[in-house]
Every structure is written in structure tokens, then in C-alpha cells.
Amino acid sequence: MSTESMIRDVELAEEALSKTAGGSQGSGRCLCLSLFSFFLVAGGTTLFCLLHFGVIGPQREEFPTGYSIISPLAQTLRSSSKTSSNKPVAHVVANLSTQGQLRWLNTYANTLLANSVKLEDNQLVVPTDGLYLIYSQVLFRGQGCPSTHLFLTHTISRIAVSYPSKVNLLSAIKSPCQRETPEGAEAKPWYEPIYQGGVFQLEKGDRLSAEINLPDYLDFAKSGQVYFGIIAL
């Protein structure tokens, strides 16, 4: 109910009492009722103003300066993004000068061997036990399609300390040619990238290799198109 409605109701009540009450006794009662109504209206108006302008209301929980509420999901994401600088990591690229074979190098720009990871015999050597992200990409390029089927393979293998036999961790095969290029037709160039990646539990001393079956088709036109790496998680 608004303040104007309350005042109007009080006035109507006073008028009704004035008509029915008589003598000094009636006047006294009207005076008491008027005073009571005045204080009631004044109190209601004051309470309305205090609530409207937020002077009083539900108590709000206060926190020290600089303290923020973070959801459990946000805390998990924040902690997982803080990777330790002493974790093993490696990123090597293909040697562009070794046509006809895939040889990995860590001496080019944007390559990395950190925290005890080694590159030996064209293999990455794992320095500590743990979970690792293993990834590799190769890019094949050709001109036209031969009469025989052309299959391109890319395999990431592991030679474990506990089981010294080569085991394929990731493997992919692609065929860029659907049919032979007709005799006399223009031999159009084709490109076929293969990317692979996965997370594996590795042991200290494990050796990892990334190999292909037809290195003559590798595209060495630009550095960074063919690479191999691991990241400790």
C-alpha cells in the first residue's frame, strides 16, 4: 500500500468517527485516534524510505579487500594451466638437407630439447616416468598419380625399457590418389598432411620414433611442416 493511500484511509476514518462520536468524550477519542494515525503514517513512510534507498535491508556478506570467490572449476583450470618449468619437453623438426630420408634435428629455430630429453639415433629418449603428450606431423607432396596404388603411412613407435621391442603407439595411412593420371593429361600436384597425437604413460629410458614409409614424397619446401615432439604432463 502506498503512503498516499494510507493517509486517505486515515482521513476517511476520522470523518466517520466525527459524525458518530458526541461531546467531549468523543472529541478525546478522536484526538487519540488522530495522534495514533499520525505516528502510524509517519513510521510507515520512514520505513518505506529506508527500504527504498537501501539504508536497511538483508545483511550482505563482506569479504576482505583483494579476496575473490572462485568456483571449483575455475580453480582447477587455473592450477592446471600452471605448468612447471622443469618438466621434460621436446620439439624437433625434419632436416631439410637430407632428401630421401627423415632425420630429426634440434638445432633449427623454434626447436627444443629441455630438462634431460635427448635425441639419440633419431629417437627421443624419455628422461622420467610419467604421462606424456606425444605428437607428430608430416606433409607429403607429389605430382600426378602412378598406375599402382599409393599408400602413405606415418607411425609413432615406442621401444620400452621393460619391453625392448618396437610397439606402435600411433599409426595412420592415407592414399592421395584415387585413380591414375591419364596419359597425356596434366599431372596436377597434390598434398597430403598427416597429424597424430595422444597421451601415454612412459618410463624413464623409453625411446620414441616417428617414421614414414615413403620419404621421397616428403615436402621439405618449408621448415616446420614436418615435426615431432613430447610434453610431460
UniProtKB/Swiss-Prot annotation:
Site residues (Cleavage), renumbered to this chain: 34-35, 49-52, 77-78
This protein's record includes keyword Transport: no
GO BP terms: extrinsic apoptotic signaling pathway via death domain receptors; immune response; necroptotic signaling pathway; positive regulation of canonical NF-kappaB signal transduction; positive regulation of extrinsic apoptotic signaling pathway; positive regulation of NF-kappaB transcription factor activity; positive regulation of transcription by RNA polymerase II; regulation of biological quality
Post-translational modification: The soluble form derives from the membrane form by proteolytic processing. The membrane-bound form is further proteolytically processed by SPPL2A or SPPL2B through regulated intramembrane proteolysis producing TNF intracellular domains (ICD1 and ICD2) released in the cytosol and TNF C-domain 1 and C-domain 2 secreted into the extracellular space.
Limits of the THD domain: 88-233
UniProt keyword annotations, A-Z: Cell membrane, Cytokine, Disulfide bond, Glycoprotein, Lipoprotein, Membrane, Myristate, Phosphoprotein, Secreted, Signal-anchor, Transmembrane, Transmembrane helix
Cellular component terms per the entry's GO annotation: cell surface; extracellular space; plasma membrane
First-listed, main subcellular location of the protein, grouped into a coarse class: membrane
Cytoplasmic-side segments: 1-35
Coiled coil regions, renumbered to chain: none
GO molecular function: cytokine activity; tumor necrosis factor receptor binding
Positions of N6-myristoyl lysine lipidation: 19
Extracellular side: 57-233
Residues linked to a glycan: 80, 95
Source organism, top-level taxon: Eukaryota
Disulfide links within the chain: 145-177
Transmembrane segments: 36-56
Localization (cell): Cell membrane
SMART domains: TNF
Modified residues (Phosphoserine): 2
Record's bilayer topology term: Single-pass type II membrane protein
Function: Cytokine that binds to TNFRSF1A/TNFR1 and TNFRSF1B/TNFBR. It is mainly secreted by macrophages and can induce cell death of certain tumor cell lines. It is potent pyrogen causing fever by direct action or by stimulation of interleukin-1 secretion and is implicated in the induction of cachexia, Under certain conditions it can stimulate cell proliferation and induce cell differentiation. Induces insulin resistance in adipocytes via inhibition of insulin-induced IRS1 tyrosine phosphorylation and insulin-induced glucose uptake.
Family membership: Belongs to the tumor necrosis factor family.
Record note on quaternary structure: Homotrimer. Interacts with SPPL2B.
Protein name (database record): Tumor necrosis factor
Protein's organism: Tursiops truncatus
Encoding gene per record: TNF
